[in-house]
Each structure stands twice: as structure tokens, then as C-alpha cells.
Amino acid sequence: MEVLMAERANLVFHNKVIDGTAMKRLINRLIEHFGMAYTSHILDQVKALGFHQATTTSISLGIDDLLTIPSKRWLVQDAEQQSLVLEKHHHYGNVHAVEKLRQSVEIWYATSEYLRQEMNPNFRMTDPFNPVHIMSFSGARGNASQVHQLIGMRGLMSDPQGQMIDLPIQSNLREGLSLTEYIISCYGARKGVVDTAVRTSDAGYLTRRLVEVVQHIVVRRTDCGTIRGISLSPRNGMMPERVFIQTLMGRVLADDIYIGTRCLATRNQDIGIGLVNRFITFRAQPISIRTPFTCRSASWICRFCYGRSPTHGDLVELGEAVGIIAGQSIGEPGTQLTLRTFHTGGVFTGGTAEHVRAPSNGKIKFNEDLVHPTRTRHGHPAFLCSIDLYVTIESEDILHNVNIPPKSFLLVQNDQYVESEQVIAEICVGTSTLNFKEKVRKHIFSDSDGEMHWSTDVYHAPEFTYGNVHLLPKTSHLWILLGGPCRSSRVSLSFHKDQDQMNAHSPSIKRRYTSNLSETNDPERQKLFSSYFYGKKKKKNRISDYSNLNQILCTGHCNFISPTTLHQNSDLFSKRRKNKFLIPLQSIQEPENKLMPRSSISIEIPQNGTFRGNSILAYFDDPRYRRKGSGIPQYGTIEMHSIVKKEDLVEYRGVKAFRPKYQMKVDRLFFIPEEVHILPRSSSIMVRNNSLIGVDTQLTLNIRSRVGGFVRVERKKKRIELKIFSGDIHFPGETNKISRHSDVLIPPGKPNSKESKKWKNGIYVQRITPRKKKFFVLVRPVITYEITDGININLATLFPPDLLQERDNVQLRVVNYILYENGNPIRGFSHTDSQLVRTCLVLNWDQDKKKSASSEEARASFVEIRTNGLIRHFLRIDLVKSPISYIGKRNDPSGSGLPSDNGSGWTNMNPFSSIYSKARIQQSLNQNQGTIHTLLNRNTGFQSLRILSSSNCSRMGPFNDVIKYHKESIPITLITKDPFIPIKNFKNSLGPFGTAFPIANFDSFSHLITQNRILVNNYLELDNFKQTFQVIQYYLMDENPKIYNPDLGSNILLNPFNWNWYFYHHTYCQETSPIISLGQFICENVCIAKNAPHLKSGQVILVQVASVVIRSAKPYLATPGTTVHGHYGEILYEGDTLITFLYEKSRSSDITQGLPKVEEVFEVRSIDSISMNLEKRFKGWNKRITRILGMPWGFLIGAELTIVQSRISLVNKIQRVYRSQGVQIHNRHIEIIVRQITSKVLVSEDGMSNVFSPGELIGLLRAERMGRALEEAVYYRAILLGITRASLNTQSFISEASFQETARVLAKAALRGRIDWLKGLKENVVLGGMIPLGTGFKGLVPPSKQDNNSSLETKKKNLFEGEMRDIFFHHRKLFDSCRSKNFHDTSEQSLLGFHDS
């Protein structure tokens, strides 16, 4: 006893969990050391101990044992945040649908996988004896994936078609599912319940086919004598140690293993765990092992090539049916895994790429010539490295070098600052042999009706040249311009022309906007701008139907008129400012008193940019002359008429100018207020005509009166006018002189009226005679406005001082004029103000009498000046010479070929290309006479446009004059082709004035055929991006600024604005500076100005100086190779197919969906798509190698190499599927199956052999031997058969007939006269004969036969001593030895082959 205690004291105590793998290893070691009998005794004790412990522990599973992982909440939130950002990018058109789906799947897969990995550590720390933890992680019941569904999250699922549902199930089964999640889960449940039976039968059928193909493979001899093997190396690190050990265990060495001069192991020695550990420890040379692939026996296998038996750990015995064992070993896990089904929705990509992270903070540098820009598979901008790239990260005192391997994506820009552990590159995992891929088509459908536009060239696919299917050559946007198409079956006769106004109530428009004019508000008016119906209707001379006025849609170049002020019986279209740009100037500082209306100064410029003498330059709306509501203006009295010569406002060629005319001199303006409601004809009115009402009386269902007084109701054809007059009523009986007056205005302070002292502001007397009643007089209050003369007004108080600086020969005068005619009623609605008096700034200049012709007009243009990084805007007014001088200069051959002003010509430069210093600006100012004023006036805090009147400044743009005066007959010389332009000098000749943008009448541009490349060369400024944006944001602007009109009857209209408008807020916009041009497409998240709202995506259809009108459009991003359905400008309806993506998708290796994947490998169906180039390369290589080595050796080597490579690849693929499910299958079993799949070659038609006919399948060994025997080449190529086809191409027709197609196989065999030698197991079972296998096989062989065999073995060895390893260089020796070889081995095979054929 003491001895026993002492021995126990010396034993090592292991306190570790023994799982299934550890238990397997322990039993192997026990068998090696103690043998079978002793090991079984030990295992009985272990079993008894296990049952005893399980009974005493009595583990049971309750719902309280399911503890959710604490980190789940923030992990899911993080994934949701990423998904939200992704959705935004998709909406903006930065990523397309496939990239979104792919990224969404990976986000949720990574989250789910991380949660799964968290389970074990979480349980180990918080509750190590949790029953769920003990059961699942010991392998006793369930696996990690099932527990993950209980306490982690269910994750992504697949729909019945096997497609991913990108909405993940975030809950786990412990928390319970929401209704949506439950419905998504139902797909998986159906798979689990219904498919289990189907899948079990699938797994059973797979097992049957596997057994069928290898049932005749039996261990027949000890050693086949092969010298070939497969080499494995523990050094290269490509193979994990676990896989390396598993591959080596139980194998037999094909060669001696040396470390230096010491022999570690010898040939034909079987490998145990001790030898494997020594190999790993000593890092031995590549180890060559024997496998079933290298066995020389055709129909069976030898002991050494098979290795150890999996049952007892010794070399396999003779007569063992290893083929059937292999088939069942592979088929059985499929059955087992089907029964414990688990669904991840087909996401077993494991394809989260490896990342390279920055070692420290610092600035990154790399050689930009070695990379080129691309998109990652998630749609992010990146750089692709074609070769190894060395990246340097400079921190304060240290340089880090990082090597980026080839074909990786670099996710940062050069000179970008990166933080420690930031992902800087993504290493592309070689997925060619890893994953199963399939090509999937994804159709994208239109979300709305609209018109299709492309922003880049699209090629016709060759097979659809006359159809509407197109292929995209490069990444670009596809735009659907929203609009309501007319779906009427009848084609209506249309008189509409482009850009016409249209009534929105017209029947060809699908939707309507109805609103009551008396309650018009700003949101209603905003609807018109956001409305995407730009219809067309013939212009009316008069609009009498006021209720439709709010539906006038703004298109083309008409400024929008808001119907706040209606002039009775006036033509609305003539009042519209068709030919003006309005530039409102607003103060930076908000007014302190919010209630005071802000006074607005607007600069008014004609659209053709030309001022004539006495033109209005700016106007000022004085808030004192602003009035809310309706009323009647009066500025003449019955007693006082003084006629004075005064200037009147007239229209002349679209330009407002003052001309002398006789008109009443007005010093006071009277306004008689009244409340007016214009109602639809169908309105129900709750007050009577000619009645008196009080304040806040109900007039209609939703209108109340604002004032009290006398009601007058007038019913007209299409509307009702309801007027309320406030005031006092006087009947004629009263002793009042007022009653004598009728419809007269009595001004205040009239000396001969005693009663007028009561009325401080004067009164308006109106006589009213109701039907059959006495008349009475209504005395209405009057508001008086004093109008000061324009000469006495101080300009500085009204206009910004910057407009009134010292100027060269430019005069400015102030003129007041009244906006309304005398006695004309004003109809104001919805609390909007009516401006009664406007103060104008009239522009004039000194005209030299000698050169009067040359200064009739002044030309306005915008100038942009950039100084010290600040961009400033100016308005420049140049005096223009007469057109005759231009034509003369243009046609003068001695001239420069270009119209010029003071010889400087017109020039252009990119405003971003140069930044001027103060010194240079001063220097330029000395050269160019004229004044430039700074943008900010520090005293007043105003910001405004400046007027530069330097007549000798260089002027922009030939379009104003060349086209204007040569429109009819003279052909236009296009800028792009003009040889006289000194392009190199463009940047230097303009000085500090930057680019001047001419304001021209763009109607005349319609006949230009090509674009002016010089003027449209500034697209996007990227200087500030590097400083302000750490996040890379690429916006795809439109590449094609042309406008195509889809109407076939009209001409194609090119970009009418051949320049680009820059929009800046008054403070310099650092974020971005896009250029807005007409017809351009804008993505939604592009910022136009700082603090400005982000625009919705769309196409610019109207550019004004301070605003842009955008037609809503939806962008769809498409990558190269995408198919586009439909033509440019085609009208599409909701639900139509827009584009089709073709992309590769990693298919699931999950066994429930993945069992078919294993089957596909065994059946050798096409899994990965092979490129055409690769196939051509292989064919070329085959031709070359046969030419170099000669016919017999070319075919032999080509077929051998192909077969060896495909065998290894197939084994790896099958193992990967099973390992992903945690199933361990020894490589030997798979190798036996794959050997049978790849054992045949196909006789080719290149050469007619005497023995085989073309297209015949023969064994590779047989083809080699027959070629040697006949001394002529047999032309053949390698072929992969698949298990079903291999089962139907064996040496036994009885075996084939019992598998499939019985009648066909038997009929064919009878016609050919085939003989079945009954070598295999199945044939003998069918015929009821003795089975030719079993481990008692060696006892049946007589000793004499055994002796003969041994003598033959020695003879064979002597004959093969001359056989060399390398068939490339020693083929003569090999050929001679093969010819002199004993025929014993081949006779039987040849005989069988001849009978087969």
C-alpha cells in the first residue's frame, strides 16, 4: 500500500477539461502503450465514473440558465449605426444595391460572429458551472451555433429561394422575437421541419453513391513498390498545426527523413504521434508520405499506401474493404449534420478581410505612381496596389515602415494624418479555392415614374444592338428625373411648346395642388418649387380665374411671381420680370427688433447683361411705404391739380428706363384700407350683402373677418368677391356737410371744413344706395404717406455706401415712383405686404458727344477675386463700344482675330489656379485704372456687390457680341478650333480680376454645336478638401453637362450656360465649392454654401443669381459591366426594370444548405467560374509541352500534372466544407473517393489508335501500359468524372446495372459482349457468390503461392532498380525498364481492358 501511495504521489495531477478530441488522443496513447485489452478495462472505469458524476450532478436545463451576453446591446447598436450610414450612402447614390447588400451582410455577420466568440469567455468568467455552458462546450449536447441562437442573436436568415434577407434577427430565443423577426424565422423553421426528411434522403443517397464508386477497393497486397509520394512541410506556415498533425497521423513515409546527417525516420515506416511531435520540434525537411493517389495498383490498394487502420491503430490488414469504409465515413457526417439542422441564412463566408493597422499616429506617405484609384467591393474609394508597396508613417521622432502586399486596397490618401490602430489597408484574401462562388443577377426596379438619363457613355451589348439593352463601360450614375407622365390612351393634340406655363389643374397632370388663395401661406408656395411637374400650356393673355393662380409653375427663365398682389384687369405676364436678375442684399446682423420688417435692397440687372442710359440699377423698398392687406391708393384730390414735367417709367427693349413725360407731381399718397376675400363660386357665405358686421364674424366655414364694417358681396362668373369697408355710417338726415360729397377724398387740414379737425389723416366719403332703401354715406378712414422728393434724399441712408463710392464717369440718381395707378384697387392676401412706393437708383454716365455711338450701352458682369484665400464677388459695369467697331476688328486680318477692348482681348482663367498676395494686387491696381472695393465694410457690417467701372479692364466672353451680331448668316468660329488663341498666356493676362462671368441672354446659344472647352474647365476645387476633411468623401458630379431634349421634333440643345455659376455664401465656404451649371445633376449631400440646407438630388433647370431651381431626380449608381434597360430620355413607370447587376456571391458552406455543395464537388459540377483567358492559356500550354517533349511524353506528363493538381484541390475543398461544421474526416477516405473520380482519361480524336476509339474512357495506367506495349502514342486527356458517372464506368457491368439505368447498361454490355470477372464485392452479392474480401483472406492463400509471390517481388525489385524518379530527364531508362518488365502485372489488366472495349 505504501508503495502504491508513493507511486501516486509521483504522478502528475492534470486539472483540465477533457473534451472529445482530448479523449480521442488519450485512448490512442493508451492503445499504443497498453494494447487493446487493457485500454478497454480503463475505458470501462472512465464510463462508470462519468455516469456516477452525471447522476450526482443531475444537470438540467432551465430558462433561467440562458443568460444574454452583456456586450450584445452596444454591439447591435454599433451595427445599426453602420447600417444607417450605409443606407444614407445608398440613398445619395454613393454605393449601389449590390455593394449595400454585401456590406450589410458582412456587418451583421461580423456582429453575430463576435457575439458567438464572446459566449465562452463570458460564461467562464460569470458562471462556469452554468448547465448551458457545461452541456454545449463539452460537446455533450448541441453546438456553439445553437447556443448562440438561444443567448446571442439569431442573425441573418435566407428566404425560400436561398437569397439573403438583409434584415437580421437581432433578438435571441431567450428574449423572444418580434412579429417581423418571427415571420422571417418561419423560413428557417420550414427548412428545419419539412426539409429534414428530404435532406436525410439526400444524405443517404450521397452515401449510396460514394459506396457504389469505391465498393471494389480492397487491400490486396502489402507494398506496391511505388517511389512517389506527396510532400508536406511544417515550415511554410500555410497549414495549421492541427491540420498538419491530422494529415500525418497514421500515414506511411515514402522516403527517409534526415536532419543533417542523422536519419530521423526510414521509408515505409508508419507515423505515430511521437514521430509527428519530433517532426514539428525539429522542423524537419519536407516530409514525403504515401497516399492512395500514388498506389500503383489499379483496382485495389496496398497496405503501405493506405496506412494505419482507424480501428486498432496498426497497419491495415489484407482483405480490408477500405473503399466501403471510406464511403460511409464521408456519408455518415452528412446524415448526422442534417438531423441537427441549424440555419445561418447562408452566411458562412468568413470573408471578413484581413486589415493592416497603423502602428502609431503620424502622417502617411507612399509612392502614388504604384497605386491607382478604385472601389472596394463595399463601394469605398481606395487605391489598389499592383505590387508590394512600402508605406512610411512619420510620427514626431520615429519612422514606421509598413509593407502592403500586392492586390491589397489602400484606404488612406497620401500625406493624410492617421491615428494609431486606424485601418490603413485591406489585404485581399485569395478566395479562388476557398469559397464556393456563384454568379447572381440582381435587378433594380424604378421607385417612381420619370424620365431616364445617363451621365456617361453607354455601349450597346453586341447581341442587343437594335434593342434597348446597354452595357456600362465605367462607373456612373443613372438618373430618373421625376415627373408625372400622361397615361392617357388617346393622343391629344398638343399646342404646347417647351418652357410654356401650364395650369396644374389640366387633365394631363396626375396630381393636383389646390389651395384657397385667401389663405395662401409660404409652404404652399414652396410646393411649387419642389413640385416636379413641369408641364406646358399655351400662354393666356389674361388670367381671370384667380383661384388657379397659385398653380402657375415656374420653368425656364421666368422669375416666379407670388400672387400676393393682384392688379385688377391687368395682364399678369407683362408684370413678370422676365428679363431681370435680382440680387438681394441682406445685412449680416439680424435686426434687433424682430417685428420690424427688414428693408431689402435689390440690384436689378437685365439678363442680357446690357444697361442702357437711365436704367434702374438698384431699388430700395422703404418699410414706411409698406402696407398689409387690401385697399385703394389715391394721389390726387378733387381740388388740387398741379401738372409738372416729371420722368415716367417705360419699358424699352426689355430694359426699364426713365423717360420724360407729364405726370402729376405727388407729394402725398393716400391709402384707403379695406378687407377683401376672393372665394370660389361654390363657397357658402354666412353674411348678407349690404349688412353690417362686427370684428371676428364668421364669413365662411373657415374664414373670419379681421375688421368690422359694411359688407359688400359681388358675384362674378367664376368667383365671389367679398369686401368689408370699415368706417362710420351717416344718414342724410344729419346736419352734416359730409352727406353732400360722394366718392371723394378729403385730405387732412383742409381750411374750409370745420368737421375735418376730427379726422387727422383725412377721410374718404363713399355714397351707398341699397335697393328700395334710402342712400347713406360711408365715411372711411384714410392713411396718409408723405413722399419726399428724390433730390432731397440722402443716398447713404438708403443704399450701402459701397454702391456710392467715387466712380469714373458713372452717375447715380435717386427716383421715387409709385407702383400702383391712381384709384386702382390693390388686392393683398395672407398678411403679405404691398409696397406702395419704391425708391430707385438710376444709372447714367457721361456721354462724350464725339463718341456717342460708342457709349450707348454698359455691360455688366460678375467678377470673382481671390485674395489671401478669401473669395470675393464684384459686379463690374463696363461701357461698351458700338457693335460696328467689333465687327471691323474681328474681320480685320491684321487684328488678333478676336474682338478686344483697349487691345487687351478677352481672357479666361481658372479662379482656383492662382492666389494673389496684397503686393501683387496693389501692383496690378496701378496698371489697371479703376477701383476695387473690399468685400466687408467694417463700419456698417453690410456685405454687398461692388461696382467696378474701369472701362479698360479686360472683358470676358465672346458670346455676347459674336453670336448676337452674327446670329443670322455668318458661321460662328468656335473657340476650341480658333488657332489664334494664345492659350499659354491666359492665366497671366487678366490680373487680379479673376474670372468674370458674363450675364448673357442665353436664348441665342441654342444653335451652338460643340462646347467651349476653355470656358468650362473648372469642375471641382480640391485644395481645401485635404485640410478640412479627414473622412474621404468622393462625390460623383455629372460628367456630361449637355441637355438633351427627348422631343424628336426639336433640335438638340447643348448646355446653354457655357460658363459655370459659383455660389458662395457671403462668408467664405470652406466645406466645398461645387459649380452649378444648367442641366447639371446634383447629388443630395453636396453642400452648395455654408449653413445652407443640403439640396435634394436632382437636375438644375433654372439658374438665377441667388437661387437655383432643381427638378427632383433619383440617382442609381452602376458599375462597369452593368446592364441598363431602356433608352436615353425614355419615360419609365414605377416598377420597371432599370439595371441588372451581375456579381459573384460566396455560397454557403453550411451543411444544411451545404450538403449539396459537397455533392457538387463529388459530382465535379462547375462551382467557380473560370475566365476565358485562363482556358486559352491552358490550351496553349498543352500544345507547347507536347511539341517540346514529343507526343507520348507530352500527353503523359500533361495528364499526370492535371490529375495530381485537381486531386489535391478536390480534397482541400471537401475538407473545408466539413471542417467548417466541426467534422473531422481523415484525408485518406476522401483520397480513395477522389482517386476513383480522377482515374480515367478520355481518348481524344487527334490521333486514331489501333486499340481505342475516340471518346472512350480508359484508366490512366492502362493507357500508359498500352502505349508502351504498342510502341505508339495514345492521344488522351485527363477528365473528372463525378461519382455517378464513375459508378457507371467500372469494369463490372453487373455493378453498373444494379446502380442506375439497368436496361441500358445490360443491353449495351450484351451488344459489346462484355465479360464480368466478378472482382468486386457488389457483383458477388448480386449473384449470391462468395465475397472476395475480409481479413481472413491471408489464411486462404496456400503457402506455395505465397513463396511464388515473394520470389516475383524480388524479381520485380531487381527489374525496377534502373527506374529513375524524374520522368522528365530519365524517360529512356524508364521506357526500357517498362518494356523489359515482367508481364505478370499487366496481363490481367490488359486482358480485362480488351474485353471491356
UniProtKB/Swiss-Prot annotation:
**Comment on bound cofactor:** Binds 1 Zn(2+) ion per subunit.
Matches recorded under Gene3D superfamilies: 1.10.132.30, 1.10.150.390, 1.10.1790.20, RNA polymerase Rpb1, domain 3
Q: Which GO terms describe its cellular component?
A: chloroplast; DNA-directed RNA polymerase complex; mitochondrion
The EC class name is transferase
Q: What is its EC number?
A: 2.7.7.6
Q: Catalyzes what?
A: RNA(n) + a ribonucleoside 5'-triphosphate = RNA(n+1) + diphosphate
Q: What does this protein do?
A: DNA-dependent RNA polymerase catalyzes the transcription of DNA into RNA using the four ribonucleoside triphosphates as substrates.
**PANTHER family recorded:** DNA-DIRECTED RNA POLYMERASE SUBUNIT BETA
Name by which UniProt lists this protein: DNA-directed RNA polymerase subunit beta''
From what organism does this protein derive?
Answer: Jasminum nudiflorum (Winter jasmine)
Gene name tied to this protein: rpoC2
